Amino acid sequence: MQFYLDFEKPLVELEQKLSELRDYSTDEVDFSGEIQRLEKKAEKLRREIFSNLNRWQVTQLARHVNRPFTLDFVEHVFTDWFEVHGDRNFRDDPALVCGFARLDGQPCAVIGHQKGRDTKEKVYRNFGMPNPEGYRKALRVMQMAEQFGLPIFTFVDTPGAFPGIGAEERGQAEAIARNLREMAALKVPVIVTVTGEGGSGGALAVAVGNRVLMMENAVYSVISPEGCAAILWKDGAKGPVAAEALKLTAGDIQNLGCVIDEVIPEPLGGAHSDHKAAAEQVRICLKKHLDDLKDLSSDELREQRYQKLRAMTMVQE
């Protein structure tokens, strides 16, 4: 699907010219000199654009429709994927995918939010907003992983938990709270990666980990910029102003010193521009952190998780 953001438009137009020149170039008509000139210009422009993004532009990138989702990472990072469906209580939730796979031969559990790219898939995936049955399915898979001694990898990319009446009636708050409690006590390594939007409790319900990683152009916040603007100024259009105040980018979160452990670099132009390259960076980081955790005892893993949560409550005067 061809989609680009407003600030990407000059780069997209330049790349379209390059594509046309390559198509027209033949043995009789040589455009190689012009092509090389435009390639250098495009590379320079790409660096200028993506090295000077403001917080609102990063938020837009985090929501990019072509950004890799959980199943894209499953395809490029893991092997032998086997998806698990249903919470054994109500129904399956396509907004949260869960299953088992291998990371470089190591069996593991994989859990993550899943959005859609076209209208039909977006509706099917509920725009990446899980119902309580999604969180209960995730907990079911985490408990299975614990039973078999498998590490757990979770991928966070959601605007938040679904706030519908049915979701509330089926215990949305209870499902999130239970996941927070149970994840803190798991006896196996848990590695969390915020890949796109890390939206409030809907993100936290699968984000209590020994390691929390964040992709370079992801965001992590208690509320969306538009939601914050609507509350503070009664105007959702002031989202860009709210984004600056929320300090929700990977760099901002890393500066807090206790929420995330590493920022995963993305290809120049964003993860949506090259899924394979983005996934390879994720794979390298996951493997590195798993190697750091694999020899820890269950008590050490739980204590580490506990201390990580405690550090977030420290107040600087």
From Swiss-Prot:
Annotated PROSITE patterns: COA_CT_CTER
Subcellular location: Cytoplasm
Catalytic activities: N(6)-carboxybiotinyl-L-lysyl-[protein] + acetyl-CoA = N(6)-biotinyl-L-lysyl-[protein] + malonyl-CoA
Start and end residues of each CoA carboxyltransferase C-terminal domain: 37-292
UniProt keyword terms in alphabetical order: ATP-binding, Cytoplasm, Fatty acid biosynthesis, Fatty acid metabolism, Lipid biosynthesis, Lipid metabolism, Nucleotide-binding, Transferase
One GO cellular component term: acetyl-CoA carboxylase complex
GO molecular function: acetyl-CoA carboxylase activity; ATP binding; carboxyl- or carbamoyltransferase activity
UniProt pathway annotation: Lipid metabolism; malonyl-CoA biosynthesis; malonyl-CoA from acetyl-CoA: step 1/1
Cross-referenced Pfam families: ACCA (PF03255)
Major enzyme class: transferase
Principal localisation: cytoplasm
The keyword Lipid metabolism is assigned to this record: yes
EC number: 2.1.3.15
UniProt key word Lipid metabolism: yes
Gene3D superfamilies in UniProt: 2-enoyl-CoA Hydratase, Chain A, domain 1
Family: Belongs to the AccA family.
Protein role: Component of the acetyl coenzyme A carboxylase (ACC) complex. First, biotin carboxylase catalyzes the carboxylation of biotin on its carrier protein (BCCP) and then the CO(2) group is transferred by the carboxyltransferase to acetyl-CoA to form malonyl-CoA.
Subunit structure: Acetyl-CoA carboxylase is a heterohexamer composed of biotin carboxyl carrier protein (AccB), biotin carboxylase (AccC) and two subunits each of ACCase subunit alpha (AccA) and ACCase subunit beta (AccD).
Name of the protein: Acetyl-coenzyme A carboxylase carboxyl transferase subunit alpha
Organism encoding this protein: Syntrophotalea carbinolica (strain DSM 2380 / NBRC 103641 / GraBd1) (Pelobacter carbinolicus)
Encoding gene, per UniProt annotation: accA
